[in-house]
């Protein structure tokens, strides 16, 4: 039996992603876990523009792809699987040919789950870290795809790329 250093404690888990895994880790150590996700990650309400972007990408629209989140890459594939499964293989083939630049460990892990790896990983998993990594690259004339997330664009990164 594992030690129970958290026995008698109630721990609120405000995580959304991997909540069950995190809760189970705490419960194995004796904690009573209250799941209270504060953030909901939702798919785009209209899959049409997402699918169009995926089709463009599969048609070799990018030389480089900057992946900011692993969740975003997995959700692109889930959208493809739900709405146009025939697009999955061409999308993955294009992803394999494209130089993949990751912001942190989560997009790198998502790539590994697909049998791929990042070509360039930011030294720091921040917007500034990715910009610093990009400064060392010659991007002029290259078609760069940027995975955005949320409702606000990443202005510093978008402005750097322009």
Predicted features by range, described:
Residues 1-162:
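Signature of uroporphyrinogen-III synthase
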């Amino acid at each position: 039996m594992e030690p129970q250093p958290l026995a008698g404690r109630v721990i609120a888990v405000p995580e959304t992603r991997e909540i069950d895994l995190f809760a189970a880790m705490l419960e194995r150590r004796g904690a009573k876990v209250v799941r209270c996700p504060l953030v909901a990650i939702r798919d785009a309400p209209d899959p049409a523009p997402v699918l169009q972007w995926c089709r463009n990408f599969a048609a070799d629209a990018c030389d480089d792809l900057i992946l900011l989140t692993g969740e975003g890459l997995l959700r692109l594939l889930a959208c493809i699987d739900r709405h146009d499964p025939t697009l999955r293989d061409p999308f993955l083939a294009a992803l394999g040919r494209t130089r993949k630049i990751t912001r942190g460990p989560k997009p790198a892990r998502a790539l590994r789950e697909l049998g791929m790896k990042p070509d360039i990983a930011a030294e720091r998993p921040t917007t500034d870290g990715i910009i610093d990594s990009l400064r060392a690259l010659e991007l002029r004339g290259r078609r760069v795809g940027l995975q955005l997330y949320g409702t606000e664009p990443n202005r510093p990164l978008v402005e750097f790329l322009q």
